[in-house]
Structures are given as C-alpha cells and as structure tokens.
Amino acid sequence: MERHYKYISENSLKYVFLHDCCCSRIHFADNKLIFEMDWMEILAQHPLNPYPQAHQSGPGIIELVHPRIIECTLAESSITQNNPQSIPLGMVAELNFCDAEFRYYTETKNDKCYQAEMYLAFDERNSLYYGTFIHIAYEKSVVMWNELNDISWFEDYI
C-alpha cells in the first residue's frame, strides 16, 4: 500500500527525538527497515519544522534503507520465563515486531554509512519479549509525517 506524506526528509534523524515514542510496527520490506510510528518528536532544528520549538507529529514512518544488522538481541519476557534469556537475531528480515516504545536511539555517520543503536521496549502483556537492542548500519534514512500537532512535552523542561 502506497502512502503519501506532506513532509519527507532524508538523513534527518538527528533532528527527531524518539524517546518514549510508540511504534505500532517494525518490519522489513523492499530492502528497508520500516518503523510505523504513532508519533515522533520533531526538534526545532529540523529543516522542515517551521516552529521555534519541537513539535509532536501525527503518525509517520521512518525507513532505514539497505539495512545491515551489526548486533541485535531480543530479551525474553520475565513473565514467561523464570530465567529470561537474550536471543540473538542476525538477519534484518527477522525483525517483525508490533507495539514497541523507543527507550533509546542514537545515530552516527562515518564515510561509508550511517549507524544507529536503539533499544525498544515491548508491552509484556502482549509479547513474549521484554525488549530488543538493535545496532544497525544503513545507507540513508527517510522520515515522513503529515502534520506537526502540539508542542513537544519536553519543551516545558528546557
């Protein structure tokens, strides 16, 4: 299904704050790791944010193009196991999760590619897993959304 977005920016994730943002689905398709976001916090410095403050977007998409896993572990839920284990994942195509919340995200760039480290937590009531840590390399990122709604929650604390 083709989606159309009003705002589309490439390689601008350093201007998107993802802590506590909810992701309804993470999956691999068309050589992209796709994050279907319920919302994102678009920082004031983002080239497509016309406001002097960070704003929360509505639903949007983050795509990591030509991704390659450097490290990925999936933590089993402590509710389903007395001795929870970490499960390594090695292929991007194995990444298919629903209802995750970003706890940590950082991006770096070198001469060859971008890299990101992220930790996402799952709702233990709906998942066999507690969360996942992903360290991934990719050629570029694309961030898409339609509207900037309210001022971001953290603007009151700056």
Model regions: which residues?
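Surface-exposed, interaction-prone regions used to assemble/regulate multi-protein complexes
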Residues: 1-158
